[in-house]
Amino acid sequence: MKFSIQHARDAEFRADGLREYFEYRDLGIRDATGGHAVMHVIRARKGTNATGEWHRHEVGLQLVYVLRGWARFEYEGVGEVLMEAGTCVHQPPGIRHRELAHSEDFEVLEIVTPADFRTESVPPPPGTAGAR
């Protein structure tokens, strides 16, 4: 592990992350922790919308803290959730979920362990829209 510092004035957002409707700012934690964790700021890309695709992540820990704007997600066993500035969400490992919509100014801080984790598309959970 090593010291790391990132400044907003040097921020670079990239559109090469997990979702095409978001931009990602790497905060250097993957490198600082030797891959034990990743931390980034994620924001909505202008002119894009959520796809509503059900998926899950193979993670040890996933925390999301909303910095600005809002988003509506749907979680297996929970239902629809509105996230807005100040909301903190712990997504248990493997929980099926999908994003339904977000504001143009939606921005979150996300922390995930490990840094390299698997994401897979999954069928809708029983009792949700599109389930068989």
Feature map (PLM): residue ranges:
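Flexible, glycine-rich phosphate/dinucleotide-binding loops
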Residues: 33, 72, 117-118
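A short glycine-rich, His/Asp/Glu-containing loop-to-beta-strand
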Residues: 14-55, 60
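A generic structural motif
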Residues: 74-76, 100
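Short acidic-glycine-tyrosine-enriched beta hairpin
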Residues: 77-94
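A generic "binding-loop/recognition-motif" signal
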Residues: 59, 79, 95-96, 104-105
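N-terminal presequences and immediately downstream first alpha-helices
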Residues: 1-21
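Double-stranded beta-helix
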Residues: 2-9, 98-132
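Short, conserved beta-strand element in jelly-roll/cupin
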Residues: 41-44, 56-73, 111-114
